[in-house]
């Protein structure tokens, strides 16, 4: 379950922070993470996280998601990114902190010849505590009328959905996408975090 990931996450985080605790950047990252942990106690709904580049947004948003999931018994975390290059990078960070089995990548760069049948099925159903996927895959799971795309829709209920670099959504899709995430928050028990990085 998602709450089983909290101890491994903090074990690895303390190890990483102990090496950087005296640097100004290390102190800033720790403060941002602690602010996110405090926000995780607030009731499910919409949240925003704007952090300067290099400020630890990825791990801070994950700390929020894990703590919020535990506090409100949410079932999984979806980390939604606009580009496959940063998906692979973020998934590698998550695996380093949570282990390989806890993280599911789902995007177009995955090689179906390398993936096992179990991995393909997990990707089709989003059957994992932490799913890292593209905006395209995420919104297709909501809007598509194909059974294969809709198969993972039920996995969105009672989840923390982190929309990283949310401002990259094309303007012409903004209204329906915002309506969809409002629906997820209002009627599916989701929490949505809109993340962006500001330039330092």
Features from the language model and the residues they span:
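N-terminal helicase ATP-binding lobe
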Residues: 1-200
């Amino acid at each position: 379950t998602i709450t089983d990931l909290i101890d491994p996450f903090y074990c690895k985080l303390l190890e990483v922070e102990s090496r950087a605790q005296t640097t100004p950047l290390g102190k800033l990252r720790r403060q941002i993470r602690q602010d996110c942990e405090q926000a995780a106690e607030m009731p499910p709904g919409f949240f925003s996280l704007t952090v300067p580049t290099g400020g630890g947004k990825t791990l801070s948003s994950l700390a929020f998601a894990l703590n919020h999931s535990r506090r409100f018994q949410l079932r999984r975390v979806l980390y939604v990114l606009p580009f496959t290059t940063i998906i692979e990078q973020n998934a590698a960070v998550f695996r380093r902190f949570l282990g390989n089995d806890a993280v599911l990548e789902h995007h177009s760069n995955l090689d179906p010849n390398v993936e096992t049948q179990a991995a393909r099925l997990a990707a089709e159903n989003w059957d994992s505590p932490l799913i890292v996927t593209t905006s395209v895959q995420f919104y297709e799971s909501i809007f598509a009328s194909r059974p294969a795309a809709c198969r993972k829709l039920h996995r969105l209920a009672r989840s923390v959905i982190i929309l990283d670099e949310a401002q990259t959504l094309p303007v012409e899709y903004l209204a329906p996408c915002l309506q969809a995430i409002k629906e997820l928050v209002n009627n599916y028990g989701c929490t949505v975090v809109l993340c962006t990085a500001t330039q330092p």
